[in-house]
Amino acid sequence: MALIAKTRPQAALVLADGTVFQGESTGAAGLTVGEVVFNTSMTGYQEILTDPSYTGQLVTLTCAHIGNVGVNPEDMESNAIHAAGLIVKAAADVPSNWRARQSLPEALKDAGVKAICGIDTRALTIHLRTTGAQAGAIIAKQMGDELTDEDLQQALEAARSWGSMAGQDLAKTVTTDHVYDWTDGSWEPSREGEPAGFRRAAVFPYHVVAYDFGIKTNILRLLADRGIRVTVVPAQTPFEEAMKHQPDGIFLSNGPGDPAPCTYAIEVAHKAIAAK
């Protein structure tokens, strides 16, 4: 059985500066646009894709072969794929891991996420490193349809009209819409008669309020591993409202977009520092 499909639909990545990389689609068909960035991690593609911090970005993974271990529900950093698109050299269609529930291409298609493979990601990364992050568009065709000059022009126009991350407040688009408590720790394999799963501390001597500006579940798990019960609140929660939970501390998560327009977050930080 082939681990990588021999035939895929045609696709292209078009940068705002006019640079074109033609390859093949390994996700959903259609057009997507965003800021083209790269990540040099050797592992963790599922965590990267589901990290809310990558909202609005087309993520290039420099590791040459992506998708070997498939996708599973335990390694999600949120409840959905947040990256606007994925760019890889080679994508595995058949995963090889006992935890896998789907292949990466299947997960991308189910989520409607556009992705391109078969391009020189090293050349793209060097180009981005030299010119800086810029907007781009992935256009992916249906199987059997030809990629045309009109498609490339459409992608170029979409990339050039997208703009940049500057001034975009994306935190309020990815934050939770309700308050919730978190006590699940990190996932561990079975040991000493215990089944595999998420661990939970016996006691929680500390309580922290975490502001969700695009928080990853792994951050919450690591806090829980240390005996910290976390109350997660929406990004625009007033500081005074957060303090009604009587926490031992305040945690401000990272998130997507430009922090400058997030005046509500800046105000919380100022008040938390002043409160000591």
Regions found by a protein language model. Name each.
Residues 2-245, 257-259, 267:
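RNA-binding accessory domains that recognize and position tRNA/RNA substrates
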Residues 244, 248-249, 254-276:
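Cysteine-nucleophile active-site neighborhood
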